């Protein structure tokens, strides 16, 4: 059964600070520096995608915090992989409502105690993506390819044979489920946030399909080989932040007709500044290979899944997730109730809401043991 958790009303202050997370162009203040903070690029030669296509050189950008700690056998026992959402990058975890709540002294992933790995997912940020120059000739990738690239980073570049935990939000949460299934003996604990272990369908698929079809049918798209950015699809782009925000938050932001129309135009402009049409198309369509439900029996890691009651992408009335999580031995599902301190799907940007569950998960597991 889902377990509701009442979180402090003070989180309403944090909610305002996190609103910009839905749009990369609305940059947050400069992030703090954490112990051992390092950025790097991992290059894979002749990366093979699951459909058979290859890329001569695939780049995966990543950030690490802290230092590896070795156990008596010489194995690293404090590595945690953090995975971001669809329209984000590793920078998602360094805003004021995330980084200090996660990596600061005494926090769940205190960078003086944990070795934290945060990659830019394939197709995003500093990692290889269509807008680098290949445009629509960039190989079609799915979540399976994204996870494969992450695994190569962790094992080949960083030399790790084990992860203490995989934690992800939205798309990153879905990929956390995939990690638990694909590499069941590699991970101690998994925390998927704001997602479900089922194929993209229903309203979740419909709004994604509307956006991708708007791009594909934009007369300026030119089959992905456009010389100037397509413009027409942008008028549907507000669907994205609308689905990320709660109804209460949107009503508060736009309580009148003029305010709502002004918000709409601001969303269109933010999309124009933030997104390349090909990159966005690939982001959304990469989710269509996601379907962990048939392989949930393979999961050995301790799982603590967290969703939010006012999340329009993962509606609370769809109770399948509680049943599916219950089918995984030792797994637990938490449904955080809606309140002053929640933002719908974007509550994932408020680490203060979900970090108590991360603390619980890490306490309930030990390195290389469950």
Residue positions per predicted region:
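Catalytic-loop region of hydrolases
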Residues: 27-80, 90-91, 96, 367-370
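N-terminal cap/lid subdomain of alpha/beta-hydrolase-fold enzymes
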Residues: 63-132
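Conserved acidic catalytic loop of the alpha/beta-hydrolase fold
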Residues: 144-164
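Conserved hydrolase catalytic core segment
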Residues: 162-202
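Alpha/beta-hydrolase-fold enzymes
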Residues: 186-270
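Short beta-strand/loop motif that positions the catalytic acidic residue
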Residues: 299, 305-307
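Conserved alpha/beta-hydrolase "acid-adjacent" motif
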Residues: 312-319
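Catalytic active-site module of serine/aspartate enzymes centered on a nucleophile-bearing elbow/loop
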Residues: 330-370
């Amino acid at each position: 059964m889902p377990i509701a958790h009442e979180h402090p009303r003070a989180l309403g202050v944090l909610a305002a600070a996190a609103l910009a997370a839905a749009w990369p162009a609305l940059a947050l203040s400069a992030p703090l520096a954490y112990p051992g903070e390092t950025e790097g690029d991992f290059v894979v030669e002749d990366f093979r995608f699951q459909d058979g296509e290859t890329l001569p050189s695939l780049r995966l950008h990543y950030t690490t915090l802290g230092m590896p700690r070795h156990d008596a056998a010489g194995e690293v026992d404090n590595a945690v992989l953090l995975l971001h959402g669809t329209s984000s990058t590793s920078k998602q975890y360094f805003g004021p409502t995330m980084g200090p709540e996660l990596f600061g002294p005494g926090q769940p992933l205190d960078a003086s105690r944990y070795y934290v790995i945060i990659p830019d997912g394939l197709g995003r940020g500093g990692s290889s993506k269509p807008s680098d120059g290949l445009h629509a000739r960039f190989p079609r990738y799915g979540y399976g390819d994204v996870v494969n690239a992450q695994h190569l980073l962790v094992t080949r570049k960083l030399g790790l044979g084990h992860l203490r935990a995989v934690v992800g939000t939205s798309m990153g949460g879905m990929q956390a489920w995939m990690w638990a299934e694909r590499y069941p003996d590699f991970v101690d604990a998994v925390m998927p946030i704001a997602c479900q272990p089922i194929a993209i369908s229903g309203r979740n698929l419909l709004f994604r399909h509307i956006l991708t079809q708007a791009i594909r049918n934009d007369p300026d798209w030119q089959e992905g080989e456009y010389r100037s950015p397509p413009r027409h699809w942008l008028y549907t782009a507000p669907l994205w932040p609308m689905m990320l925000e709660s109804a209460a938050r949107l009503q508060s932001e736009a309580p009148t007709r003029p305010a709502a129309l002004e918000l709409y135009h601001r969303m269109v402009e933010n999309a124009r500044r933030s997104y390349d049409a090909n990159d966005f198309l690939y982001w959304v369509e990469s989710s269509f290979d996601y379907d962990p439900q048939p392989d949930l029996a393979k999961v050995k890691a301790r799982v603590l899944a967290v969703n939010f009651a006012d999340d329009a992408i993962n509606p609370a009335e769809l109770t399948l997730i509680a049943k599916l999580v219950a089918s995984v031995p030792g797994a637990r599902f938490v449904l955080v109730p809606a309140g002053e301190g929640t933002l719908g799907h974007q509550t994932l940007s408020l680490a203060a809401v979900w970090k108590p569950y991360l603390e619980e998960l890490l306490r309930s597991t030990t390195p290389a043991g469950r």
